Regions:
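Structural recognition of alpha->loop->beta junctions
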Residues: 227-241, 245, 292-315
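Functionally critical loop-and-helix segments that line ligand-binding/catalytic clefts
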Residues: 142-154, 295-342
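Hydrophobic anchor at the start of a short beta-strand
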Residues: 205, 278-280, 302
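Aromatic-lined carbohydrate-recognition surfaces of secreted/lumenal glycan-active proteins
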Residues: 272, 276-289
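Single conserved hydrophobic/aromatic residue that forms the stacking wall/gate
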Residues: 1-16
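Non-catalytic tandem-repeat scaffold regions and their flanking low-complexity/translocation tails
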Residues: 53, 64-74, 79-86, 94-141
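N-terminal propeptides/leader regions of secreted preproproteins
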Residues: 14-94
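Substrate-binding cleft of extracellular glycoside hydrolase catalytic domains
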Residues: 145-267, 273-275
Length: 342
């Protein structure tokens, strides 16, 4: 989501391939190194007699084909035939399986193999214009509830196409608090359009407020601002307190400690409840672990952002699994979420 926040959220070993020097490779003067081939007589071409081959087989000396050095020249047609007869089947068994991409069903489970890696995909994926979710083992999961989140930075959406892609809900930014000492409350200029169009397309709706509250009073003001904009309109999903770093890393609340940030989140959520709505808190895994006390927020809906994984690493009601999805109905990249509560 292109709101005011940071998406931030070797020792490289250089391998030098050392080729073993071929004793028969041409030297700089054009002659062969250790040129013993010129000393061969016709009888030298036959290295082993059939009797010697049989003795070697009986003793196990030829058990490992890769360890043998048999001169398979045109003169040794018999040995070439014998070598292929002995070890040909083994070579066939060791041929790698052909690369595969696309959908595949194995033991009653459905997987999708990526075209670029030929490996099973995991996590949230958009494939041929439809959203899918694959668990950590690459198994496609059914009955998944997909949603997106949007703000003024996403415009020109075709909500009917978005719904057909598998999206059933949207979380819309209702507003934010500005920079500076004043910290004015601002309604997202695209909120009404997004809200109306999403409803008309039959999508369920929730909202979030990008907070920069530095104390509990400001957090309550933000919640009251959300209720004022909604003006009694019903929601299907919570009003989320969005806490994260500002885009310029110089936001009013960026320097808050864990205790103060947690108090702001609680004050916001309690005021949302007082206004008759369901409250929730949005943050990344890092923030839930380091910047805010998750244990004190578990009575509220938790919306966790964590990308490039097969699922949320913390318990939550909603998981934002990617910010780079591409789906029909929107020309750019967009956040996609999974709701675990329907």
């Amino acid at each position: 989501r292109d709101r005011l926040r940071s998406r931030g959220l070797g020792d490289v070993y250089k391998r030098q391939e050392l080729a073993a020097q071929d004793p028969q490779a041409p030297a700089a003067d054009g002659t062969a190194q250790n040129d013993t081939t010129s000393q061969h007589t016709p009888e030298d071409s036959v290295l082993l007699t059939p009797e010697q081959i049989q003795q070697a087989l009986d003793s196990g000396a030829l058990e490992d084909a890769e360890a043998q050095c048999i001169d398979l020249t045109d003169e040794n047609g018999f040995f070439r035939w014998l070598f292929n007869w002995l070890f040909g089947s083994k070579a066939k068994e060791e041929e790698p399986a052909p690369a595969y991409s696309g959908w595949r069903t194995e033991n009653g489970k459905t997987y999708y193999y990526a075209q670029d890696t030929n490996k099973k995909v995991t996590g949230l994926r958009s494939i041929d214009g439809k959203l899918y979710y694959f668990d950590a083992n690459g198994v496609k999961q059914d009955n998944v509830t997909f949603g997106i989140d949007v703000s003024k930075y996403q415009s020109g959406l075709d909500w009917n196409k978005i719904k057909k892609s598998g999206v059933s809900f949207v979380i819309i930014r209702i507003g934010y608090r500005g920079y500076g000492a004043a910290g004015n409350l601002v309604k997202d200029p695209m909120f009404e359009e997004h809200f109306t169009n999403a409803r008309n397309a039959g999508l369920k709706v929730g909202v979030y407020f990008f907070s920069q509250a530095v104390n509990e009073n400001e957090a309550r003001e933000e919640a009251q601002g959300c209720a004022y904009v909604l003006n009694g309109r019903k929601l299907d999903y919570p009003i989320y307190f969005d806490t994260e770093a500002s885009g310029g890393k110089n936001g009013r609340a960026d320097g808050l400690g864990v205790e103060d940030r947690t108090k702001c989140a609680i004050a916001f959520c309690e005021e949302v409840k007082a206004q008759g709505y369901q409250p929730g808190v949005y943050a990344s895994t890092l923030w839930f672990r380091k910047r805010i006390d998750l244990n004190r927020l578990k009575s509220y809906s938790i919306w966790n952002a964590h990308y490039n994984v097969a699922g949320s690493p913390i318990a939550c009601d909603m998981w934002q699994g990617t910010c780079t999805a591409r789906i029909p109905g929107y020309g750019g990249q967009i956040d996609v979420n999974i709701s675990y509560v329907g």
